[in-house]
């Protein structure tokens, strides 16, 4: 069971150089992803006089996020695993693939990367409007939670199938492409209803910079729940039992 492999982590893990490198990689990858993803919406809105919330704008957002995530995951994969998403990190934690301490370090790096990306967008565009995530008319908070949960389930399930599963083989090579594709497809499916976040960091940065926090909890509860379910389902059904690896207990063990 994945629960038996969940670990808090050793104190030495926080001070280990590899943890610092992984945090920097997550910060940069998330910055790249959010800057390109949110920036594409700002650019489309400027070019079309506020047309980001149109079918064409949705397609542009889907394409930009898919391409940006492909790059962000690729450049971080060999250093941090290329999570670029607190929900993915949470799914990895639930599956026993990362300790709690290291997961929290990843979260801080990802959230900071998103905030810095949004601040840079505001500065670089001369204060252009940055869109915060919100619910469309007729979409309730619980509707959005379910939507985010299902979309993030698909994302984290894809991550497990292509990047985490020890039996993935050559499939691991295309993991960043598959991950980018599922996010792009989900934006086409859910973008018109709640913005299709699937990533608490992507929602957090714009909320901090714009000060718009209405229903922000939706973009945490839905993705985290979906990630946990995906991790448990994939691990229990497809990965199954595997030997528990003792986490390092001293700095010398790393």
From Swiss-Prot:
Organism whose genome encodes this protein: Zea mays
Entry keyword set: Membrane, Repeat, Transmembrane, Transmembrane helix, Transport, Vacuole
Motif (NPA 2): 199-201
This protein's name: Aquaporin TIP1-2
Subcellular location: Vacuole membrane
Function of the molecule: Aquaporins facilitate the transport of water and small neutral solutes across cell membranes.
Keyword Transmembrane helix: yes
One Pfam family matching this protein: MIP
Highest taxon, organism lineage: Eukaryota
Single annotated GO MF: water channel activity
One of the record's GO cellular component terms: vacuolar membrane
Bilayer disposition of the protein: Multi-pass membrane protein
Record flagged with keyword Transmembrane: yes
GO BP terms: water transport
Residue spans crossing the bilayer: 24-44, 56-76, 103-123, 144-164, 173-193, 220-240
Free-text domain note: Aquaporins contain two tandem repeats each containing three membrane-spanning domains and a pore-forming loop with the signature motif Asn-Pro-Ala (NPA).
């Amino acid at each position: 069971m994945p629960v038996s492999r969940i670990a808090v982590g050793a104190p030495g893990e926080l001070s280990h150089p590899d943890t610092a490198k992984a945090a920097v990689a997550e910060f940069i990858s998330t910055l790249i992803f959010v800057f390109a993803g949110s920036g594409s919406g700002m650019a489309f809105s400027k070019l079309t006089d506020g047309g980001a919330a149109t079918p064409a704008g949705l397609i542009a957002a889907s394409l930009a996020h898919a391409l940006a995530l492909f790059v962000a995951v690729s450049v971080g994969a060999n250093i941090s695993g290329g999570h670029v998403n607190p929900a993915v990190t949470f799914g990895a934690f639930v599956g026993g693939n990362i300790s709690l301490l290291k997961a929290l370090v990843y979260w801080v790096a990802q959230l900071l990367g998103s905030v810095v990306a949004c601040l840079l967008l505001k500065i670089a565009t001369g204060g252009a409007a940055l869109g915060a995530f919100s619910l469309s008319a007729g979409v309730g908070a619980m509707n959005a939670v379910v939507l985010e949960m299902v979309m993030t389930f698909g994302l984290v399930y894809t991550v497990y199938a292509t990047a985490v599963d020890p039996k993935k083989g050559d499939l691991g090579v295309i993991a960043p492409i598959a991950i980018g594709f599922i996010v792009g497809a989900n934006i086409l499916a859910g973008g018109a209803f709640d913005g299709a976040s699937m990533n608490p960091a992507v929602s957090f940065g714009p909320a901090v910079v714009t000060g718009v926090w209405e229903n922000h909890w939706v973009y945490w509860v839905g993705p985290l729940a979906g990630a946990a379910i995906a991790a448990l389902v994939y691990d229990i059904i497809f990965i199954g039992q595997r030997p528990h690896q003792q986490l390092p207990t001293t700095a010398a063990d790393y």
